[in-house]
Amino acid sequence: MRHQKSGRKFNRTDAHRGAMFSNMVASLFKYQLIKTTLPKAKELRRVAEPLITLAKVDSVANRRLAFARLRNKEAVGILFSNLGPRYITRPGGYIRLLKCGFRHGDNAPMAYVEMLERPIIAEEVT
């Protein structure tokens, strides 16, 4: 029986799921806003928020722990240089999920995953 087992499988192997979430977290840290399905967004929050908490204390050991999870030097650099100092006073809840309707092909619920307090880039409206 599957009692007390947390986390979604997404019909993927363990390695595929881990690679998918490390890539999604790297994209989230790079772009500050990504669009994905709602279940993936909810699981992404469980992966990304502990990494941001880890980045509040910049040490070699913490950088190595983050790199072991992400396997992406650029994402680790962004995490410790931008995100850790940005959220130093916030006790958690660094990510916002915004539902944005359903995908046309399969009617899957979609959501935006957004970093809080992200810099807003003004786009020209014509």
UniProtKB/Swiss-Prot annotation:
Record flagged with keyword Cytoplasm = no
Q: Which residues form a coiled coil?
A: none
Family annotation (InterPro entries): Ribosomal_bL17 (IPR000456), Ribosomal_bL17_CS (IPR047859), Ribosomal_bL17_sf (IPR036373)
Q: Cite a single GO BP annotation.
A: translation
Q: Which Pfam families match?
A: Ribosomal_L17 (PF01196)
Keyword Signal belongs to the record: no
Q: Which GO terms describe its cellular component?
A: cytosolic large ribosomal subunit
A single GO molecular function, which one? Answer: structural constituent of ribosome
Q: Which domain of life is it from?
A: Bacteria
Q: Which UniProt keywords apply?
A: Ribonucleoprotein, Ribosomal protein
Q: HAMAP family from the xrefs?
A: Ribosomal_bL17 (MF_01368)
Q: What family classification does the UniProt entry report for this protein?
A: Belongs to the bacterial ribosomal protein bL17 family.
Question: Quaternary structure?
Answer: Part of the 50S ribosomal subunit. Contacts protein L32.
Which PANTHER family does the protein's record reference?
Answer: LARGE RIBOSOMAL SUBUNIT PROTEIN BL17M, RIBOSOMAL PROTEIN L17
The name under which this protein is listed is Large ribosomal subunit protein bL17
Q: Which organism is it from?
A: Xylella fastidiosa (strain M12)
